[in-house]
């Protein structure tokens, strides 16, 4: 155990030196190698204030691992052992999809730009033996599933929205006995389902069919059903999306990247504009937009559906901003781990505990949506004070007759 801890600390020093002074791509490779080997030390900080009861479980921390980090079953369980309370494999399509994929790292902005037209993954069918093998591990783990972009385009042109239902149902049926939650991924910026997220006639049948399928496939303990929405949503579309999620009675909603550089002029990444780069971005530049999206969604959901957030979380402050906006859980993504290293979990836990105690919260649950609730209260109070006050000249005359 001591040897493993020393090895982990040594790897962490090398990793951090590579990020700060040399080559982020090599740090990226070292990160995955170290996690696959299980060499990095635990970063869990035990404090009851971080605990929350959610989805029929007690989670010791609101911090988890986003999808996109582990598509081959190599590192997620190692990360869970480091102290994260939940994690997501994927995203996966039914069969293997390997579109061209290139990543660009921007250290100063703590951002990663990916140029990829689809969901690069080995496919659910190939991963099934691994899911079966790890089914009895105690970790609270989900699987993210999606439809290939080319399938979506073909189905939309032919008006065959039912094809989405069939494919999501088939994937859900296979994985339901082997996970704690299933995430229906509508977030890819190149995805037509991303555009149709506001169309209840397309999304609701998928949600309802999957919920019914998982009950039949895993009757004793059916997995929860989450929906992952795109960050590229127009803020004016949030009420429609919230109505669809409530009507579908989903168990959770995931608000996460990536964001499209082409669609979001607010995103500024040093070097990307000069080279006229396009693609999808994760990391620090998405944080502000993610927080605002959480706040608006929380307002319309009225706390009835837990929000799982992921977007530019690099310390306790940015994690708390998501929580205060309305997120019940917070995920770290690939950018967080690469630019801050595996030690980010200890950093976030330590700083989050300090923030919660400083703000006089007795439990983590009390902090969820605290900023948003204040904004709602102020807005309601403002609307009340701005109502015209009619003062009758004669108290015997009813106000409507004046």
Residue ranges and their predicted role:
Residues 67-70, 144-148, 229-235, 303-317:
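Glycine-rich beta-to-alpha transition loops that act as phosphate-gripper elements at the mouths
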Residues 88-96, 254-261, 313, 319-347:
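Glycine-rich phosphate-binding active-site loops on the catalytic face of alpha/beta enzymes
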Residues 32-45, 189-198, 238, 242-303:
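Glycine/Thr-rich beta-alpha phosphate-binding loop at enzyme active sites
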